[in-house]
Curated annotation (Swiss-Prot):
Residue numbers spanned by region 40 X 9 AA approximate repeats of V-K-V-E-E-P-V-E-E: 676-978
Organism name: Dictyostelium discoideum (Social amoeba)
Record's catalysed reaction(s): L-seryl-[protein] + ATP = O-phospho-L-seryl-[protein] + ADP + H(+); L-threonyl-[protein] + ATP = O-phospho-L-threonyl-[protein] + ADP + H(+)
Protein name as annotated: Probable serine/threonine-protein kinase kinX
Biological process per Gene Ontology, one example term: signal transduction
PANTHER family registered for this protein in UniProt: CENTER DIVIDER, ISOFORM A (PTHR46485:SF5), LIM DOMAIN KINASE 1 (PTHR46485)
One Pfam family recorded for the sequence: PK_Tyr_Ser-Thr
Annotated Basic and acidic residues bias: 410-424, 603-639, 670-801, 817-884, 946-971
Binding of ATP, residues: 28-36, 49
Length: 1094
């Protein structure tokens, strides 16, 4: 037979803790021996259990024994599901057990709180943690003997910790069944209740009751048991277990609660079963929140007064908690019902059992002799009662208002119950003690009779009766009738318990005093609760008033904000209306202006389109008829232009005249020469060369295309610079010189000016040199200028369909063969002078090519042959070829001798028939030499503008030149660059001249695209006369060289470069003499057109 070691362990150094190292923070619960505090040990959070036993306590021996077991047992545990022991501390005879802190509280709180959702997976996991902890304890031969939900703590991760090992004891194999009755009745096994021997399997039955509590979330009660103290299956299955509970959990519960211990599974088997059950449940759950400790207050342990006075420091300002929630984390008893007060896990009252031999060390204050006698016991009881009263009074007096809890309707119910109990007690006290004594004597007699009938095996066993009259849940409160029944049962059980274990009787006087004290205490509690209710009601009223006031203020703010927003919106609307009115006014004004401009523009376009349609529909007429029609068209154009342009051009003319006065004085001589022919071709060539040099220098700086500028000059000369200049001046009045693309078709003059070379070189200066301004005034409305503008097909490339087919590169490579001279004739068609175009064959470019060949290489003869094959159909192609020729001229001088012929053809198309007067292009060649485009591949740079070849797009401004209608020179596409007298002197010069004339013929926008030659003010003052002659005459002129220049015989026009236009009769086509242009004043005296010479 083994024995159980019940001696209190000595305070080892490993487990002893200095009291000064402990810091008390707040009270978190109470237990069988005292209170539990939250504190810190050397900065680590811990739970501190205060054990306070009076030296005169009659239950001192059992209490010491209970404490000794818990300390000895808990020291042995190291398991994640068992609470960890930290150490023991002593101060003035009071022990403090220090363990790890579990802040979640006991499991019973979560089970009885129905508002907390506990999924089945979580419930199974809780049961598994408990089974693992108990399996560990049983492996150490330890029986817990008090397993219940209040001894299961929940940490922050929902890990379960088993605690409260006061009843645990180590069981030896030899004597593992003879143990005393202990634990809590509702979780107690049948063998323990009946007083039979039991072992660790008793914990398995208690675990089954805990599992039933987890499943049903109902507190265990006697009605759940049957006659054999097992589970009543019908009641449990039909009333307690939810319908969605897994059947495996139900089966496991009944197996654990089997009446026969041999049929109960071990905790190892239970753990395996629970693991399998978890696999069948949904693990995707949300864990409930863990409750926090209630109000906490730091308590200083370094205060010397506390140590001197002795005992643990008293905690002040702790709230007096009275609610339906049990916040005692380490609570060893269940205080919810009165029937648990005497049956919870607390050491049994003192008995005369001699086996209690527990003693403390000699240095401990617990060492005392046994106390005998009724008087000493009474004194001890009185001392305990006084101490309890003092603690309660201090807790009530020092109650802090800030820590008052808010009580709900449950609190009011509880208050009413206390009031009823108080009244009942008072009534009972008034009846007198005589009745009570009689009742007490009768009860004793009945109990003695019962004892005689029953055979008691051991004096330590007690009788327990289970009643199934009440049904308890955590949320429901007990009724008055139930409380009365419970009180009666408690009294009966208490009597039986006392007769079984105690041999002493309490005096009636002490009972009366104790009852009076309790009554006073209850009255104080009731008063206190009433005060708290009143205080809370006042607070609620104040809160409601404050809320109403805030609501009113909020409404006022919203109204003010709404009004402010309305005002802002109104202001914005007013501003928008004002802005709309202003915009409407401006829009109306702009519409009026636009309408006027559109009317003017429509008039011009209408006239142009009419004239163009007529030119297309009609077949070529004889020269006389054509001349008469030309006069009529000129008169019409003059009238229209004067009405549209003169009004706007007066102011600009005045400004330009003021600026050009000094220049005109310098250039008076060329103005005088206007009516005089060129004295000699050599002189004109020299003058032209000098002027071209100036232009080239000027053009080189602002524009990379001096050659184009020269071509534009030659083209303007070929088109009778007098008319061109006049148109330029008129257009200046309307708009300042800008890019030809920007100029509208209404203002062709502007487009002519806008040519980039004109802007950069200041086309005004060349106008001054040529002083064509006066003739401009005379020839303001010349049809050829307008026709140049009218060349809408050039812009759209509709007129010149072959333009699309022929690419610029092809024209460059084989300008003569690919580019047909007929193209410029087509260009003349949009310019309204299609007849001369048809009559005039583009043999002039052939001659130009010959001249180029003579100047550079004799290959131009070859070029003439493709010229003969060329048919003048598409001036646009010629223009493209001109642009291409420019590029090639810049690149190769010798091979591009033919290219300048194309360039000349393009010049003819562009109305730049200046090359007819070979002298000027020859002169132009000199500035080209200055630029050294031939020698130095600078003209290659010029090629970039040629590549730009935007002038094709610029043909739009050519359309703008419709009022000018300078198509006459366009019609007579003179190979002006070809007719150059200097090619024999400088063979390379004419080539350069051709290239230069091509570049100068128009800005990078007009060089190729404007076959009707846009008028541009150029430094050269020579005039260009376009002589329309039959193709045969032009061929003859080409065949007869004049001063090493090939005059175009086949060409329809001859360009006589003269400083100023002079009134002279037309010269024969084969003569080398220059024919001056006829001024508009002498048109009526002539029998031929001002542009063509017989």
């Amino acid at each position: 037979m083994g024995s159980v070691d019940t001696s209190v362990p000595s305070f080892d150094r490993a487990w002893s803790i200095k009291y000064e190292d402990l810091d008390f923070i707040s009270e978190i619960g109470s237990g069988g021996f005292g209170k539990v505090f939250k504190g810190e040990y050397l900065g680590a959070p811990v739970a501190i259990k205060k054990i306070h036993i009076l030296p005169d306590d009659p239950n001192r021996v059992d209490l010491e024994k209970f404490l000794n077991r818990e300390i000895e047992t808990i020291k042995l545990f190291t398991h994640p599901n068992v609470i960890q022991f930290v150490g023991i501390s002593e101060n003035n005879g009071i022990l403090f057990i220090v363990t790890e802190l579990i802040e979640g509280g006991d499991l019973q709180y979560y089970l009885k709180n129905q508002s907390i959702d506990l999924p089945w997976f979580l419930r199974a996991n809780i049961a598994l943690d408990v089974s693992l902890a108990m399996s560990y304890l049983h492996s150490k031969s330890i029986v817990h003997r008090d397993l219940k939900s209040t001894n299961l703590l929940v940490d922050k991760n929902w890990k379960i910790k088993v605690c409260d090992f006061g009843f645990a004891r180590i069981v030896e194999e030899d004597n593992n069944k003879s143990m005393t009755i202990c634990g809590t009745d509702n979780w107690m096994s049948p063998e323990m209740i009946t007083g039979l021997d039991y072992d660790e399997r008793s914990d398995i039955f208690s675990f089954g009751i805990v599992l039933l509590e987890i499943i049903s979330r109902v507190k265990p009660a006697p009605y759940m048991r049957d006659a054999s103290f097992g589970l009543a299956e019908d009641i449990v299955r039909n009333q307690l277990i939810p319908t969605d509970c897994p059947e495996s959990l139900i089966d496991l519960t009944f197996n654990c609660c089997s009446v026969d211990p041999n049929n109960r599974p071990s905790f190892k088997e239970i753990s395996q079963t629970l693991k399998q059950i978890k696999t069948t449940l949904d693990s995707n759950i949300v864990y409930p929140e863990i409750r926090d400790f209630e109000q906490q207050q730091k308590i200083s342990t370094t205060n010397g007064n506390n140590k001197q006075n002795g005992g643990a420091p008293k905690i002040n300002n702790l709230p007096l908690q009275y609610s339906n929630n049990n916040n005692n984390i380490y609570d060893d008893d269940d205080d919810d019902d009165d029937d648990d007060d005497d049956n919870d896990s607390f050491p049994r009252p003192y008995s005369d059992n001699s086996n209690s031999n527990v003693t403390l060390e000699s240095n401990s204050n617990y060492n005392s002799s046994t106390i005998n006698g009724q008087e000493q016991q009474e004194q001890q009881e009185q001392q305990q009662q006084q101490q309890v009263k003092e603690e309660r009074d201090e807790g009530e007096i020092e109650q802090d208002d800030d820590n008052i809890e808010v009580y709900d309707s449950d609190y009011q119910k509880k208050l009413e119950e206390h009031q009823k109990e108080l009244l009942e007690r008072q009534n009972q006290n008034q009846e007198g003690s005589t009745d009570e004594n009689e009742v007490y004597e009768q009860e004793e007699e009945e109990e003695e009779e019962d004892e005689e009938e029953q055979v008691i095996s051991t004096p330590a066993k007690k009788r327990i009766s289970f009643g199934q009259d009440t049904f308890h849940t955590y949320e429901a409160y007990r009724t008055d009738d139930e409380d009365d029944d419970d009180d009666e049962e408690d009294e009966e059980e208490g009597d039986e318990y006392d007769h079984g274990y105690d041999d002493f009787d309490e005096d009636d006087e002490d009972d009366e005093e104790y009852d009076e004290d309790e009554d006073d205490e209850d009255e104080r509690q009731i008063q206190y609760y009433q005060q708290q209710l009143q205080y809370q009601q006042q607070l609620q009223k104040q809160q409601e008033q404050e809320y109403q006031r805030q609501q009113q203020l909020q409404l006022q703010r919203e109204e003010e904000e709404y009004q402010r927003q309305l005002q802002q919106q109104q202001q914005q609307q007013q501003q928008q209306q004002q802005q709309q009115q202003q915009h409407q006014q401006q829009y109306d004004d702009d519409d009026d202006d636009d309408d006027e401009e559109e009317e003017e523009y429509d008039d011009v376009i209408r006239h142009d389109t009419d004239s163009e349609e007529e030119s297309k529909d009609k077949t070529p007429l004889p020269w006389d008829q054509h001349f008469e029609k030309q006069k009529e068209s000129e008169n019409k154009v003059e009238q229209e232009e004067t009405n549209v342009v003169v009004a706007n051009s007066q102011e600009t003319e005045q400004q330009q005249q003021q600026q050009q006065q000094p220049k005109e004085e310098e250039e008076e001589e060329p103005t005088k020469v206007e009516d005089v022919k060129v004295e000699t071709e050599e002189q004109t060539k020299e003058e032209h060369d000098v002027k071209v040099d100036e232009e080239s220098t000027k053009v080189d700086e602002p524009v990379d295309e001096p050659t184009k500028v020269e071509e534009s000059v030659e083209q303007v000369k070929a088109e009778e610079p007098n008319k061109v200049e006049e148109l330029v001046e008129e257009v200046k009045v309307e708009e300042e010189p800008t890019n030809v693309e920007e100029v509208k078709a209404e203002e062709p003059v502007e487009e002519v000016k806008v040519e980039e070379p004109v802007e950069e070189v200041k086309a005004e200066e060349p106008v001054e040199e040529v002083k064509a301004e006066e003739p401009v005034e005379e020839v303001k409305t010349e049809e050829p200028v307008e026709e140049v503008k009218v060349e809408e097909p050039v812009e759209e490339v509709k007129v010149e369909e072959p333009v699309e087919e022929v690419e610029a590169e092809e024209s460059v490579q084989e300008p003569v063969e690919e580019v047909k001279v007929d193209e410029p004739t087509k260009v003349e068609e949009p310019t309204k002078v299609e007849e001369p175009i048809e009559e005039v064959k583009v043999e002039e470019p052939t001659k130009v090519e010959e001249s180029i060949e003579e100047v550079k290489v004799e290959e131009p003869t070859k070029v003439e042959e493709p010229v003969e094959e060329i048919k003048p159909e598409e001036p646009t192609k010629v223009e493209e070829s001109v642009e291409d020729v420019k590029v090639e001229d810049v690149k190769v001088e010798e091979v591009k001798a033919e290219e300048p012929t194309k360039a000349e053809e393009s010049v003819e198309d562009v109305k730049v028939e200046e090359p007819i007067k070979v002298e000027e292009p020859v002169k132009v060649e000199e500035p080209v030499k200055v630029e050294e485009p031939v020698k130095v591949e600078e003209p290659i740079k010029v090629e970039e503008p040629i590549k730009v070849e935007e002038p094709i797009k610029v043909e739009e401004p050519i359309k703008v030149e419709e009022p000018i209608k300078v198509e006459e020179p366009v019609k007579v596409e003179v190979a002006s660059p070809v007719v150059q007298e200097q090619p024999p002197q400088q063979e390379e010069k004419p080539e350069v001249v051709s290239t230069s004339t091509i570049t100068i013929a128009s800005s990078p926008q007009q060089s190729s695209n404007s076959p009707p030659s846009t008028p541009v003010k150029q430094p050269q003052q020579q005039e260009i006369e376009v002589n329309s002659t039959p193709i045969k005459q032009q061929q003859q002129q080409q065949q007869t060289p004049t001063q090493q220049t090939q005059t175009p015989t086949k060409q329809h026009t001859e360009i006589n470069v003269q400083p100023t236009p002079t009134k002279t009769p037309p010269l024969p086509p084969q003569t080398n003499e220059k024919i001056p242009l006829i001024s508009p004043n002498n048109k009526s005296n002539r029998g031929c057109c001002s542009c063509f010479i017989q």
